[in-house]
C-alpha cells in the first residue's frame, strides 16, 4: 500500500500566535493518526519561482490515512485556530508503492 503525504509550503505568516496555536493542535491530530513529521521548518532553498517561509512534510501509512486525518474533528479544530493566520499551499498526495 502506498503511503500518503501532506506537503505544505507556507508562503506568508500573517499571525504568529495563530500559527503557534495551530501547530500544537495539528501535531496532536497528526500523531494520533499515525502521522510522522519528516520536515518541519528548518533550512530550505526555494527554487523555480518558489516563495516559502516554512515547509512541512508529513508521512502517513496510507493515502487514506492522510485524507482521514485532514477530515478528522481534531485537525478541523486546528484549522479553526489557524483562521487566516497564514497563506499556504497544502496538498495531500499518494506516494509511490
Task: State each model region's role.
Residues 63-91:
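C-terminal structural segments of small proteins and small subunits
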Amino acid at each position: 500500500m502506498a503511503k500518503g503525504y501532506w506537503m505544505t509550503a507556507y508562503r506568508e505568516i500573517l499571525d504568529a500566535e495563530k500559527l503557534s496555536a495551530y501547530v500544537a493542535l495539528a501535531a496532536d491530530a497528526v500523531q494520533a493518526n499515525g502521522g510522522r513529521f519528516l520536515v518541519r521548518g528548518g533550512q530550505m532553498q526555494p527554487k523555480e519561482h518558489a516563495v516559502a517561509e516554512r515547509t512541512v512534510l508529513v508521512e502517513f501509512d496510507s493515502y487514506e490515512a492522510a485524507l482521514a486525518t485532514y477530515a478528522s474533528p481534531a485537525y478541523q479544530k486546528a484549522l479553526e485556530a489557524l483562521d487566516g493566520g497564514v497563506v499556504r499551499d497544502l496538498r495531500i498526495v499518494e506516494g509511490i508503492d
